[in-house]
Amino acid sequence: MTITIKSDNVTTGGTLGNVNGLKDQDYTLLLDFQNGEYTKKVGGVITNLTEADVLTCTSNKTLATKPMTMDRLGNKLYITKTDQTRWWQVKNAFGDFFGLLIESEQVNWFLNSATPITQTISNIPAGSTMVASCIGTGSITITGEGINPVTVTQDTPATITPQSLSTTISLTVTVTGTLSHVQVVRCAGFAGVHSPITTTTSRPTSGFDKVEINQALIAPLLAGTQQLTILIQSVPLQHTKDDRSQYNETRVVLETTALVAGLGLNKAANTNIGSRIVSTYKSDGSSHVSSGTVAISAQLNAPVTQVFSVGDFGFKGSVNGGNVYAVANATGLNNVTRIRLAEGVAAPSVMQGGNCVITKLAVFKKQLSDQEIKEFSKSWL
């Protein structure tokens, strides 16, 4: 007699013998935010960890703006502490994602956002590119001098790019139908929807998310490490079409005794993406290196897996299985003491902080060949 066993479950991103989706199992630290599973591997021994073991949160969110977090069932909850870790679920054409929510500080320029009525927004600073979004069954129509009129619904947020960027901006936002929230936010990094920022008759800043891998965890794991590779997957809440020629966001910030380096993602108006690195000297804040590329074809709102490899060879990166981008003079990133998640890097080598959901992250204490880097960056896709 022959017995056939069938399963209704379909595995993605790996085989049954490789259920975590990694292209290489020789990792030191694996943080699967999607499934809430965290492990370290020392001497071949795997140890399970908790969220408290792996993350340190020093966020400074403004509770008056009613910042939200989300559970794995998609339920939205208001946070109760300014330094609370936030989570978010994203469902789009590419899948169902869940992970750590990181957003930079923003202002919602639309007043009384939870009881929206038609209004004019004045004195938006020059040089602003904005994203308008709303929640509900109605819509908003945005008009103003120097912009192309646009109508926005819950499913169709839009980028607003003033034709003249040298003067302050005024917008008229006309509300139609039933809406529970309206938002007009200036872009920081990529053009995309920010989680809801509630306003009243004033518009306080949202505050920022600031999360890093627990230093007490990585200190013994990375002590004396000369070659380090970080693998990370991120997905946006919802990007909108953006005609700016090129822009960027961090995904990881590495810190050594001498340097702070932002490793992130470049994006172009044609939606091409690529690796980026900027780093500064801690002693005087001067630039160490600033370099990037946008050579990889990508689709708007698709998940992105990136490999960042640093060592005596400098920096090497790959995105979604694309060609390796190398920066030979980006040396000195040995003996990493901190790994911060999607935090901004200040002048002179600026990289905007990330606005994204980080679903997975893995750390490897070894140098990879170019072919391995390309293969690693196909993980979880």
Please identify what each model-predicted range represents.
Residues S128-C134, A219-H239, S245-T250, A302, ...:
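A carbohydrate-recognition surface predominantly in extracellular/luminal proteins
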Residues N301-G317:
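Short tryptophan-centered beta-strand motifs in secreted/extracellular beta-sheet-rich domains
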Residues I147-V152, A158, S279-T305:
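Short, aromatic/His-centered strand-loop micro-motif at the edge of beta-sheets
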